């Protein structure tokens, strides 16, 4: 018997308004969303239960998104299988996303429907 599809998405975003927008939009699309405001909270959450996908802001208050990914993958090798959707306003976001092996990249500002579509594709692949 096949298990239920993991639809849990970890959203890591320090801006309250953006985090709320992403979280509510993904929930409206039927995804199970958990949010973190910084890398420390995100690491605890990701280690407790592996998400199906991660929506990651690169610029976080306690450490940058690349440091979060490195620590997570170091402590949980199967994290390499989890697709990452980078959401960032940084000019170098595509280069950083490439280094992380991210599945998708969204700039800020972003079109909500496009972000939701990318996250849904990441979860299903």
Give the location of each predicted region.
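Short hydrophobic/Thr-rich beta-strand motif most characteristic of the beta2 strand and flanking loop
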Residues: 30-38, 45
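The feature encodes the CheY-like receiver
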Residues: 61
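Conserved acidic carboxylate
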Residues: 13, 88
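Acidic catalytic/metal-coordinating carboxylates
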Residues: 38, 64-67
């Amino acid at each position: 018997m096949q298990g239920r599809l993991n639809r849990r998405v970890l959203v890591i975003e320090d801006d309250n308004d953006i985090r709320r927008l992403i979280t509510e939009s993904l929930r409206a699309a039927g995804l199970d969303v958990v949010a973190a405001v910084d890398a420390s909270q995100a690491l605890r959450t990701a280690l407790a239960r592996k998400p199906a996908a991660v929506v990651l802001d690169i610029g976080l208050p306690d450490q940058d998104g690349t440091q979060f990914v490195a620590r997570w993958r170091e402590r949980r090798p199967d994290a390499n299988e989890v697709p990452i959707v980078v959401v960032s306003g940084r000019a170098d976001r595509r280069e950083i996303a490439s280094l992380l092996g991210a599945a998708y990249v969204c700039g800020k500002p972003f079109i909500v429907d496009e972000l939701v579509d990318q996250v849904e594709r990441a979860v299903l692949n």
